[in-house]
């Protein structure tokens, strides 16, 4: 039967990609359906109970800057917050939060249920309705048909999901959830390149069976950081510590002697796992010279004894898992609540997508999250927000949008995926961004919120807060620029006493702040300025201290932007361009880049080939002008 009303956008899947996609579409005023196999698992953290980290927090704050839910849900559920790389420069600093799994999920569900224009329905999706290479809707497990001209598929690990524990395996989307095998079969009928990837999770431990006295305590930071630009520390629940222990020679011996029982090393698993989050058996095999590996003992929440031992993800048989866990200091008597496992699943080559995350071959069909070959909640959420936004823009008859590499880590993520593809689960790092001094986590709102408002993603409350912050930064910069300190005056002497730097002549406070030894808080203390919003103070200090470097990056971006944004015609035939080698013609035909900048990042496409493309475009443009004037 057909559902009685029609939707404009349908989102399949209620994980981190699906929730952000559905919320983005609905925030833009588009009638949106979120289809999930189980309402109780909306926003569920399938793996580790943490949000953020190096490169990842930048994505979380960009999602937040565009009105998304992830950062706010983290502030309301975070039970430990830390800033990583705190002693390094602002470009690589990253906020990481340990979350209470149950609270996080409850917050996400509450946000979803209170979002106007969003309907939620519990049913698995078994089929897509496709007519003349255009998606028209979906069919659920019970045969119910929903119609919409845009569908966002965020299937996570559910497409053809196969769970492995030792040499035993069974179908599943994750532990306790069924796979989406009917949909996986339907997807394989479409003209899209499909592959298999793998990820894994460690056994969960009962905290009552662990001896924390022999472990190293790892408390959170003070003052407690926040994740959302709209958040504050008062939102956080009770804060707790994590703990650190290590594997040892005995642990490694147990693993090495049982590799023949590992599905990874016996050839049972075909999919490639995440390079930067390897299983413990992978670590022992690849880093045989290391005597030990860190294990972070992370609490799963405030109302459970379950612990997540980050660092020992494994798919070895249960008896071996028990031996491994009990060989680690502090866990000699540990009770395993849930065994670790690996899961294989289908993903689709992201080179078959446009920048909007719409597939090139099926109009209106968008992919987001692990289906595109990524790993991580943050990467999924970022793609979900972008896909949901573009599905809504399509419904509204507006042009699609994707930030450039110099505008957002979301832009870096998407450009990497659709240009280079991936043969292993893709994880974001700050090192992937060429312009990371500009793309800091602290200025995500200044980079993206204005665009979010234009797109319809930002509500009035967030917009008012953003405008107040932006005006506050301009006002404080102007005050520092126009306030002068002279040698021999009480203020001048206070500056000398505070920082130990003599004043040769008069300086503006902005000039003084640019000095490496001068910090904003100390300068205000010495000169008697008023205490301002910490977010404003942070921006003023970073912009002043790194002004020269930031200006140079902006100049470089401006130089490259002209050719970067030059669009390549949809109907361009690369085989007719003289001078291009057959190999490069083949690469360009396969990838079908949208811009000259994207073409330049395809492996094997040389600068000389880009010059030939530019010449071809100029000739083509001149030829069309002559035709029009004739």
UniProtKB/Swiss-Prot annotation:
GO cellular component: cytosol
Main subcellular localisation: cytoplasm
GO biological process: tRNA methylation; tRNA wobble uridine modification
Residue sites binding FAD per the record: 13-18
Compartments in which it is found: Cytoplasm
Disulfide bonds: none
Recorded GO MF terms: flavin adenine dinucleotide binding
Residues that hold NAD(+) according to the record: 273-287
Cofactor: FAD
Keyword terms: Cytoplasm, FAD, Flavoprotein, NAD, tRNA processing
Xref: Pfam families: GIDA, GIDA_C_1st, SAM_GIDA_C
Source superkingdom: Bacteria
Tagged with keyword Metal-binding: no
This protein's record includes keyword Repeat: no
InterPro entries, per the entry: FAD/NAD-bd_sf, GIDA_C_N, MnmG, MnmG-rel, MnmG-rel_CS, MnmG_C, MnmG_C_subdom, MnmG_C_subdom_sf
Assembly: Homodimer. Heterotetramer of two MnmE and two MnmG subunits.
Function summary: NAD-binding protein involved in the addition of a carboxymethylaminomethyl (cmnm) group at the wobble position (U34) of certain tRNAs, forming tRNA-cmnm(5)s(2)U34.
Family that this chain belongs to: Belongs to the MnmG family.
Protein known as: tRNA uridine 5-carboxymethylaminomethyl modification enzyme MnmG
Organism of origin: Pseudomonas entomophila (strain L48)
Lineage: Bacteria, Pseudomonadati, Pseudomonadota, Gammaproteobacteria, Pseudomonadales
């Amino acid at each position: 039967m057909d559902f009685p009303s029609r939707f404009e956008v349908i989102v399949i899947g209620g994980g981190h990609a699906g929730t952000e996609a559905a919320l983005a579409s609905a925030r833009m005023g588009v009638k949106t359906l979120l289809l999930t196999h189980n309402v109780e698992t909306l926003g569920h953290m399938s793996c580790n109970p943490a949000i953020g980290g190096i490169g990842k927090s930048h994505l979380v704050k960009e999602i937040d800057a565009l009105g998304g839910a992830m950062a706010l849900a983290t502030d309301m559920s975070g039970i430990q917050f830390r800033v990583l790389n705190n002693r390094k420069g602002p470009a690589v600093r990253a906020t990481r939060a340990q979350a209470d799994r149950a609270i996080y999920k409850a917050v996400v569900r509450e946000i979803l249920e209170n979002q106007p224009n969003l309907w939620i329905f519990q049913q698995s999706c078994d089929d897509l309705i496709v007519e003349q290479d255009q998606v028209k809707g979906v069919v659920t497990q019970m045969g119910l048909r929903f119609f919409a001209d845009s569908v966002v598929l965020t299937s996570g690990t559910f497409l053809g999901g196969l769970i492995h524990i030792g040499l035993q395996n069974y179908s599943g989307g994750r532990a306790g959830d069924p796979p989406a095998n009917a949909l996986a079969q339907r997807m394989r009928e479409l003209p899209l390149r499909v592959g298999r990837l793998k990820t894994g999770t460690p056994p969960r431990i009962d905290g009552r069976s662990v001896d924390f006295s022999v472990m190293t305590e790892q408390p959170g930071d003070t003052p407690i950081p926040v994740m959302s630009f709209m958040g504050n520390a008062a939102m956080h629940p009770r804060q707790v510590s994590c703990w650190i222990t290590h594997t040892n020679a005995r642990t490694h011996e147990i693993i090495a002697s049982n590799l023949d029982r590992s599905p990874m090393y016996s050839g049972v698993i075909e999919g490639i796992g995440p390079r930067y989050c390897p299983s413990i058996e992978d670590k022992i095999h690849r880093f045989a010279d290391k005597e030990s590996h860190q294990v972070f003992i992370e609490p799963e929440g405030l109302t459970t004894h379950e612990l997540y031992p980050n660092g020992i993800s494994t798919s070895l048989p249960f008896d071996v898992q028990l031996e491994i866990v009990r060989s680690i200091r502090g866990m000699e008597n540990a009770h395993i609540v849930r065994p670790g496992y690996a899961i294989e699943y289908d993903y689709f080559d992201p080179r078959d997508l446009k920048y909007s995350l719409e597939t090139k071959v099926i109009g209106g069909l968008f992919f987001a999250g692990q289906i595109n070959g990524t790993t991580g909640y943050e990467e999924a959420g970022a793609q979900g927000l972008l896909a949901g936004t573009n599905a809504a823009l399509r419904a509204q008859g507006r042009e699609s949008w994707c930030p450039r590499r110099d505008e957002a880590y979301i832009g870096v993520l998407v450009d990497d995926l659709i240009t280079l593809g991936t043969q292993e689960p893709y994880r974001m790092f700050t090192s992937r961004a060429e312009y990371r001094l500009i793309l800091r986590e602290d200025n995500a709102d200044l980079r993206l919120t204005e665009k979010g408002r234009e797109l319809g993603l930002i509500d009035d409350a967030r917009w008012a807060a953003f405008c107040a912050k932006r005006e506050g930064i301009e006002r404080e910069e102007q005050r520092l620029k126009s306030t002068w300190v002279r040698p021999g005056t009480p203020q001048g002497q206070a500056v000398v006493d505070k920082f130990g730097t003599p004043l040769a002549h008069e300086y503006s406070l902005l000039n003084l702040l640019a000095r490496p030894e001068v910090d904003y808080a100390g300068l205000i203390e010495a000169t008697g300025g008023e205490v301002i919003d910490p977010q404003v103070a942070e921006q003023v200090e970073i912009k002043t201290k790194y002004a020269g470097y930031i200006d140079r990056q902006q100049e470089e971006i401006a130089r490259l932007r002209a050719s970067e944004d030059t669009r390549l015609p949809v109907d361009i035939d690369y085989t007719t361009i003289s001078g291009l080698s057959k190999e490069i013609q083949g690469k360009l035909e396969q990838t079908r880049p949208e811009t000259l900048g994207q073409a330049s990042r395809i492996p094997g496409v040389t600068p000389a080939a880009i010059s030939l493309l530019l010449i071809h475009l100029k000739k083509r443009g001149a030829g069309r002008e002559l035709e029009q004037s004739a």
